[in-house]
A protein has these predicted regions:
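C-terminal helical subdomain
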Residues: 139, 155-191
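Active-site helix of classical SDR
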Residues: 79, 115
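Active-site-adjacent segment of SDR/Rossmann-fold oxidoreductases
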Residues: 104, 125-136
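Residue(s) in the substrate-gating loop at a strand-loop-helix junction
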Residues: 99
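Conserved mid-core segment of classical short-chain dehydrogenase/reductases
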Residues: 50-65, 108
């Protein structure tokens, strides 16, 4: 429906069903894409979930495992089928969608923040591994995007963006060949300031902040 709404010709797009939490499923989808569409210029690993977590609750450990399976293992599996052929061609871009939440941990967001911090570090590692190959690795760190999921949040979301505005800015960043970009730029400034805060100041600033809703909380 999305592609049809954009008026794309049928030969220019194809949907491939896959379960991002199952490595072989997502790798197979990538291989089917290569077989039917050829090698793309850009691969974007965007799948992600965000569920509140309380480490004292046993079932929330499973939430953390699911979060990492989706946000991290799924991301690497998405890239996997395309790395060798892109390297052989000497061009291409692998884009990992992280989050400003990966810059500092937020109470009640342990699984999500940790997973997005891991995305940032993983993409940085992969960028170094592919240096000189012609394949770029781009890390995009969105702030708050207005979606049905974020509308469930119980706290203020500064600099909230509409999805199309974010997509346009992300496209521009990828096209410009940047290696890392926080969108919108205001959240990038906020994130840098938060990173510089001493722990005692940061902890005090977040005291009493509403937490992300847990799956059964």
């Amino acid at each position: 429906a999305w592609a049809q709404g954009l008026g794309l010709a049928p030969e220019r797009w194809q949907a491939y069903a896959a379960d991002v939490q199952v490595v072989d499923s997502i790798v197979d989808a990538g291989q089917r894409c290569l077989a039917s569409q050829g090698l793309p210029e850009v691969v974007i690993a965007n799948a992600g979930i965000s569920i509140g977590m309380d480490t004292a609750v046993r079932e929330d450990i499973d939430v953390m495992a699911q979060t990492f399976a989706t946000n991290n293992i799924g991301l690497a599996a998405t890239f996997h089928p395309f790395i060798a052929p892109m390297t052989q061609r000497g061009s291409g871009a692998l884009v990992g969608i992280a989050s400003v939440a990966g810059i500092r941990g937020l109470p009640g967001h342990g699984a999500y923040c940790a997973s997005k911090a891991a995305v940032i570090s993983y993409c940085e590692s992969l960028r170094g591994e592919l240096r000189g190959s012609g394949v770029k690795v781009v890390t995009i760190g969105p702030g708050y995007i207005d979606t049905p999921l974020t509308r469930q949040n119980r706290y203020a979301m500064p600099f909230l963006m509409q999805p199309q505005d974010f997509a346009d800015k992300a496209f521009a960043a990828i096209s410009a060949g940047v290696s890392y970009r926080v969108i919108p730029w205001q959240m990038g400034v906020v994130a840098k300031l938060l990173r510089l805060l001493p722990n005692r100041v940061f902890d005090k600033a977040l005291a009493g902040r509403p937490r992300k809703k847990r799956r059964n909380g």
